[in-house]
Amino acid sequence: MPYPPNYGGVIDVFYKIKSLHAIGIKIILHCFKYGREEQEILNSLCEAVYYYERKLNPTKLFSSKPFISITRNHPELLKNLLKDGHPILFEGLHSCFFLDNNALNQRYKMVRMHNIEWQYYKGLLKGEKSFVKKLYFNWELKKLKSYESILSKADKILTISGKDQYYYNIRFPEKTILLNCFHKNDTIRRNNETKPFCLYHGNLSVPENIQAALYIAKKIAPKVNVPIIIAGKDPSKLIVDEIKKHKNISL
C-alpha cells in the first residue's frame, strides 16, 4: 500500500505514481492491504485501484520461494492483470510471484528493485537478537538470493542506486537501468545555515537502524563538536534514552 509515503520503498512508489500521473500516464494500481487501509488519494491518481489481502499462512514458510513473495500469490491479481495487455511494473522482488507466469509471456515486464533484498535480510540477521527471528532471516536470505533468478523473465530491471546497478548489471547485462528514487522534492532549496551539522535519517524502529543510531551516539558524538540530528519514524526507546546522554544530539 503506497500511502502514506513514510518510509523508503513506499516513498519511491507513491511519488513515482504522482510523477507518471502528472505527465499523463494512466495507471492501474494493484496493491496488498498489509497493515494499511484503502486510501482515497490513490483513486485520484490512478484509473483503477485493486486491493488484495495478503494471507500470512505459516505453512508457506516451508516453501522454496521467499515468504514475502509466496504470500502475495493471489489468484485475483493474475486474473486482473490478464484483463488488458498493458506493460507491467513489479515493485520489488517480493511482488514478482507472477513474473514468470506463462500467461504473461507476451507482456512487457519491468521490475523496480528497491534494494538487494537478500543483502538487506543479511543486515536484519546481524542486527537481530531473537534466535527464532535469526533462523527466519537466515532461511529467507538464502531463498531470496536464489529467487533473484526470476528477474531473467523481466524485460527491464530498474535499480535505485549505483551499487545496486553494478550488482544487477553483472547478473543481468543489458536489462538494468539506473533510476534513482522518486521523492517529494521537485526543487532544490539553498540551505543558508551557517553552522555545519550531521544528519542521520531512517526508520528508527528496525534493528539495523537502531544499531547505526546507537553507534553514532556512543562512538561518534563524543568525538565531534558539530550538532548531530537523528531523524525518522518510531524511534526505539534505546535511541531515545541514549540521546538524552548527549548534549550535541537532537531527535
Where in this protein do the model-derived segments appear?
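Conserved catalytic-core segment of nucleotide-activated headgroup transferases in glycan assembly
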Residues: 12, 170, 178-247, 251
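A short, charged, and often flexible helix/loop element on the N-terminal side
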Residues: 49-78, 129-137
